């Protein structure tokens, strides 16, 4: 196992216009303060205001949005980071691990990774993801990529259909089809900060949001040693070269994760479990009393000093005894959150320290809060109650189905842009209005300038006389559409769908 030295991981250089020379502790901290400013002031963070956590299109301001959730995750991430650094200081490990002058950047990277962790999520969350992937699968049929004979390939896009005698091109076709059918919020987050927003963050800060290490074009089984880290797609073909450079700059082996990402993940796990239950009470899906009984029933028999007793029962008893001064709801969730954090944050911090050799190497193939402990059981309890009583509620399911229909419908509305030939679409991009394509011209005008420029830049770098050019052009055209629709807020997607379907003016 390589020696642990965080100076080799907390890389303060940037992809473009990077600061040069050896920096003092204060100068390095200023570089990460610049990252904070770029992130907090970015439109991607502001759009989280109108993307909801569990309840799409929610008008009740007390129910969490992706932004308020991300701020809560940021606070928990800061708490865990401080706990880790405090324990390392007590053990006299800060200097040994190269952290004695990097505690500020350590905390800042964790905080900003937490704030950014949801920026790539499409409207309507996982149902938006599913809608995008299902729509593209129905047209690209990535499962036919190994079809024999090749004439069995059902792909409806001529440029991406497998052809006899074109094996090198066929392999690229397989990768592109697989990649486009695996849209994922975390991978889109990487694309946002690097390709679309061009935020030029430090290598370490981007490493903090590379949650999964599986390429989106991956086919087949993942290695047993990395099955958790490669559970979902982490980046797209379009960012392959950037991620290769990121790995080099952060000393990451293939399919390995940046150490501070485990802290961001733990902060998210702790935050959303309690938050989803609190939002459900705010939405009157169940009362606090009903929630307590759901939790009690799901946990089962327990001793007086058990974790359930110390966290959930304690919160319930305190909230009832103070019910005259404040509402039982507010009191219960305040105590539940405090009790949960007081148990889970120190546990997550200790797990990080205990497993630091594997975490530093990027190969720890688990979440910090997924093990055989009572702390892990407590998180599972919150998640299971939410799945059983919140996510399966008819109101929630109806909104999710509506969200799926909205995203599918928007993709269908913009499909004419994908149906144009390469030469016709190139003409449309150059002229912005082509008389013989009135519908396509108007659809193209609706696309965001930022996304259109990203497409133009990507395609302009390709050699137009290469046999691969039509494949890559179509790939980036699909990305253009995915970028535009996934970047919408819930409300904008809903309104746009209704307008374009002529439901309202």
Swiss-Prot record:
Record key words, sorted: Hydrolase, Magnesium
Catalytic reactions of this protein: dGTP + H2O = 2'-deoxyguanosine + triphosphate + H(+)
Acyltransferase is among the record's keywords: no
EC number(s) on file: 3.1.5.1
Matches recorded under Pfam families: HD
SMART domains, alphabetized: HDc
Domain HD: 66-273
Entries under InterPro entries matching the protein: dGTP_triP_hydro_central_sf, dGTPase, dGTPase-like, dNTPase_1, HD/PDEase_dom, HD_domain
GO molecular function (one): dGTPase activity
Enzyme class, spelled out: hydrolase
Assembly and oligomerization: Homotetramer.
Stated role: dGTPase preferentially hydrolyzes dGTP over the other canonical NTPs.
HAMAP family the UniProt entry points to: dGTPase_type1 (MF_00030)
Protein name: Deoxyguanosinetriphosphate triphosphohydrolase
Record gene name: dgt
